């Protein structure tokens, strides 16, 4: 008997190669998945100007990045909320209130069309950076207690509808169901951290596995297998780092690292 529903992960129509250039922008969930790719030596940029929760702030990050020589092969945009804060004095949406008095800001909720428009602008900028970029939209599974749980669900629904609208009109944009995997497939508090809001490390690892088993190229999967034993040695903290045995192990490991660098030009420690 099957006691859980397994969420289908769609084929994106492309594959992520070994040590590919990736960009992650969005909520703290983007940090979690982006850092997981970093561990596996993909060339990753993660929220370079801090965590961005809403589509407008995600656009602001990409606007700043567009002036830099960055050309990601794949960009993940992780949507956290449709709530934004406008500075009363100027009307601009701010990315961070920077602990300024709350009276200086007006909180608003972006509509589905607002969110979709900000995402479309972001995608256009990304295509200027790399015409062949693949864009992945995902909605963070992290709930927002401060909105109330019903309000949090309404916010997520707005983001889901906006993501669906954008994916439907852009062939090179696809959706990864992280929100659905956590809330429909796992749906158990043992998969959350102590605050009962943020996914646990185990959950992040599960989502990473679901993503990589479908979205990585065969070459990238081979690379992960070759890199895994070397990563284990390099991450190990020896009891006797000055011993001849450990030095011999490190010499052998570094030779294998050099072999990987020859095989995969983008690979770097």
PLM-predicted stretches and their roles:
Residues 1-269:
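Extracellular glycan-modifying ectodomains
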